[in-house]
Amino acid sequence: MPELPEVETVRRGLADRLSLFEIERVEVCRSRAIASSGGVAAFLVGLTGARVGTWSRRGKYLMAALEPNRGIWGVHLRMTGQFQWIEEPSTPCTHTRVRFWNANGHELRFVDVRSFGEMWWVPPDVELTVGIPGLARLGPEPFSEAFSAPYLKRQLKNSSRPIKTALLDQALVAGVGNIYADESLFSAGIPPLTPAGRLTLAQLERLRSSLVEVLTTSIGAGGTTFSDFRDLEGVNGNYGGQAWVYRRGGEPCRRCGTIIRRDKLSGRSTHWCPTCQG
């Protein structure tokens, strides 16, 4: 699933490409892609004729302000959702779910192989967290002042769950997934199986700082591509080649030479170095 850096990369691409994009026509090819109240019919009414304004991101959610005063267009890519910018008319692929055109015939196409991606239209008189309920459950952004070592200490007090599992909890911190949980724990020198409640304030500060650094580096590299992720222009993310541990199970650690372990934790593959994180 695309995580914060990949979603931020998409947000930046959409902000560049769709500046003043006026939606002349919308086609929903798969109705389950529309998750908002009112379904496809309301979604079509809400977006058709609107001008796309500022794009924002909250965790793994994308949101565009629709102008003038037309509400919010929300998107979650889930496992395999991706946007494609099409300037010349072309036949959509089998996995095309939603299509948007402007008056010039340029198309924004939403393609989703696994079909878990979702879109919402939130009317201007509806609270955003009501229109997109998942937003209400999100914890602070990793780059925010609210995400601090004392915050983590309070939230994880007496918690026996592994710190890797805790980092995947979107209610603790928004936008982190398997890739950057593994990478930040390696950078902080913390074993992923450590009970979260046992971490000291100093360790939590190291983890916070490491997470911010790893996410910043990945955003600068355009995110990570291991399977389906592409940016708006179809370009792969480049962070994967820089990864210290993620998907490197059985290979030598780039830092110390110890073989990277790959364990299952809460059903997720977890990669770590027994020496650097010992």
UniProtKB/Swiss-Prot annotation:
Residues the record lists as binding DNA: H95, R114
Domain of life: Bacteria
InterPro entries: DNA_glyclase/AP_lyase_DNA-bd (IPR015886), DNA_glyclase_Znf_dom_DNA_BS (IPR015887), Formamido-pyr_DNA_Glyclase (IPR020629), FPG_cat (IPR012319), MutM-like_N-ter (IPR035937), Ribosomal_uS13-like_H2TH (IPR010979), Znf_DNA_glyclase/AP_lyase (IPR000214), Znf_FPG/IleRS (IPR010663)
SUPFAM superfamilies: Glucocorticoid receptor-like (DNA-binding domain), N-terminal domain of MutM-like DNA repair proteins, S13-like H2TH domain
GO molecular function, one term: zinc ion binding
Note accompanying the cofactor annotation: Binds 1 zinc ion per subunit.
Pfam families: Fapy_DNA_glyco, H2TH, zf-FPG_IleRS
Keyword terms, alphabetized: DNA damage, DNA repair, DNA-binding, Glycosidase, Hydrolase, Lyase, Metal-binding, Multifunctional enzyme, Zinc, Zinc-finger
Stored SMART domains: Fapy_DNA_glyco, H2TH
Start-end of FPG-type zinc fingers: 244-278
Record-stated family: Belongs to the FPG family.
Assembly and oligomerization: Monomer.
HAMAP family to which the protein is assigned, alphabetical: Fapy_DNA_glycosyl (MF_00103)
Protein name: Formamidopyrimidine-DNA glycosylase
The organism's taxonomic lineage, starting at the top: Bacteria, Bacillati, Cyanobacteriota, Cyanophyceae, Synechococcales
Name of the coding gene: mutM
